[in-house]
Regions:
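Extracellular/periplasmic carbohydrate-active domains that bind, remodel
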Residues: 1-217
């Protein structure tokens, strides 16, 4: 299997970056704007081909991360990436990320004890995505009372799936496709409401989705 270093080369440029930290709080009110429409950011389709295109937020190997009551807008690439973290809490976060290819909303990668609650996400790519770029498992995740809308997949596992995924509960959420893509890049509302793409050797266990509404997918 690949390592985190193999799969994340050139992706550490971000407006907010933390590695090996504890007790992080990013809270509002207020707004963080990644200015992803700026012409100085490369515009090719894939992140791997454009290492100069930053995330808005990338948090690696951190503990006790709390993001709440804030709006995150217009990243050049992914909006929020949490990699190999423990005890992550996202509450009342609004994400509007539809300016470029690869405009994911929330990416959870090898994290444990995660709560995503009362968040509102509209993204050009995956709205909320579970990834496994290393062999560290993603475990004990709760997503509830969220609105997740996307031009691609509203709720997704993969495609980086070297690690395993277990004990995930998604409930009381509204998910689907955005009404239109303001970037004009994809010319569609959505690929799917829920997409489970285990392609790299990881396993999916005890992944429960209940009481959700899907439209425009």
């Amino acid at each position: 299997r690949l390592t985190v270093q193999d799969t994340n080369m050139g992706m550490n440029q971000s407006l907010i970056f933390a590695e090996g930290c504890e007790n992080i709080c990013i809270c509002g009110g207020g707004e963080l704007d990644g200015q992803g429409t700026r012409t100085n950011f490369p515009g090719d389709e894939t992140c791997h081909g454009t290492p100069g295109r930053p995330f808005l937020m990338r948090i690696i190997d951190c503990r006790d991360v709390h993001v709440h009551d804030i709006t995150l807008r217009s990243a050049a690439c992914w909006m929020e990436n949490y990699l190999n973290c423990d005890r992550v809490l996202l509450e009342r976060v609004t994400v509007r990320n539809q300016t470029n290819y690869n405009n994911d909303g929330i990416d959870i990668d090898g994290c444990r004890d995660v709560i995503i609650r009362n968040c509102d996400v509209e993204s050009g790519d995956d709205a909320c995505c579970f990834k496994g770029a290393s062999e560290r498992n993603t475990e004990r995740v709760l997503i509830e009372n969220c609105r997740l809308y996307s031009c691609c997949n509203a709720l997704k596992v993969g495609t980086d799936t070297q690690g395993d995924f277990r004990d995930v509960l998604v409930r009381n959420c509204q998910i689907g496709g955005v009404e239109h893509d303001p970037s004009g890049l994809k010319h569609r509302c959505s690929d799917s409401g829920v997409s489970l793409e285990m392609v790299d050797g990881g396993t999916l266990e005890n992944f429960l989705i209940e009481n959700i509404t899907i439209d425009r997918a």
